[in-house]
Amino acid sequence: AYDHEEHLSAWKKIMEAAEEHNDPGKFTTFNAYEWTVRNQEPESASYHRNVIFKSSKAPKRPFSSFDSNNPEELWNWMDGLRSDGLDSLAIPHNPNGSNGQVFKKYKFDGNPIDKDYSVQRMRNEPIVEITQIKGTSETHPRLSPNDKWANFEIVNSRKGKRTAYSEPDGSYVRQGLQKGLALEHEERGNPFKIGFIGSTDTHNGAYIFDESDNVGTAAILTSPEVRGSIPIPNETLTEDIKNSNFIAEEEQGFYSGGETISNSVGGLAAVWAKANTRDSIFEALSNKETYATSGTRIRLRFFAGENLTNLDFNDEEFISKIYENGVSMGSDLILSGPKKPSFIIWAQRDKNSAPLQRIQIIKGFYSEQDRETKEYLIDVVCSDGLKPDPISKLCESNNATVSTDTCEFSKDKGASELKTVWVDEEYDPNIETFYLSLIHI
């Protein structure tokens, strides 16, 4: 049953906590909540949205699934607040478990997406979560069969129903970017011109770097046994674990449930903000000047322009000159005439993680001739003095290894920093194209 007073009381406490701990310039908090919906049987798929408010102002009561399961109604509510001076944005998360709901070409009522829908969605949802503990939502082997890394941290089950398969079509962001181009070609607007963040989804705001500092999620999901981090010998099983719905008794004994054992360490959201304040961070999120990592604290810059090849990485004003002459990640580049776009990609490793191996560009576009979207994988810089193969356009392996027993990785392979200026010599000015940068370690 829905307890209205309890709902308001909990929301009031959340806002009070956000205000108490917000310290501009040092530690930024937002008034925010999770809009949680779930489709009815037999689909039972779901994907949730984190709704973040820009300022200390917040509505008296958040819009919940008790109001509507329709995301368009959520956007209408957000638009109404915005007209009253209260800005917000929503971030869909865990699209990989949505069973194709996130990047479908139809509205909630089944009618085709149109321009009004596209404009409203982009106004309210400029970014999407691409990775978290319940798997990555970048791409899937069925969607990117030519990408040998497409199976990275794949969880094939639905969110909210781990026994059911989640349809990849409509659940992964690289395909979503392509669908957006196809919809724009059909003059229906582009609702999927999105930026990315990564998250943990542990519901405690804590990032886990290794097993020694794992703070878990809920209490019943925290122990190494339940998370599948270590085997579960029968002699160590307690009655509490035996009675937990995360453990099942079979002829072979006890084992950890699939939901927690498949969880990864989670991702991180990186935001290029002018200051550590609500206004600056919210502005960067809205402008999509963000990127995601799968957990490592990689530092990444990605710019595009008409002619960035004459800029010097060693110039003390290098970054400011790029902003003057180009656009940052998440932006549109409008070329003045039949020119080739140039890109600056600059990545630095996390000192506590593995060295960098390559910078890869995913190029996607709509082919008028074939009447379909396509994507190409292009390695633009390799570590260890290697060069991309002229035919495959991919770097050769640098033979770095990772031990499956100890997780130790090669420390004499890879680079602390990779950077390059890359020009797309095959660019067609008549075809709208997107570029996604990936850093491999």
Where are these regions (language model features)?
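A metal-dependent hydrolase metal-coordination microenvironment
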Residues: 1-86, 90-104
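C-terminal functional module detector
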Residues: 3, 7, 15-18, 37-38, ...
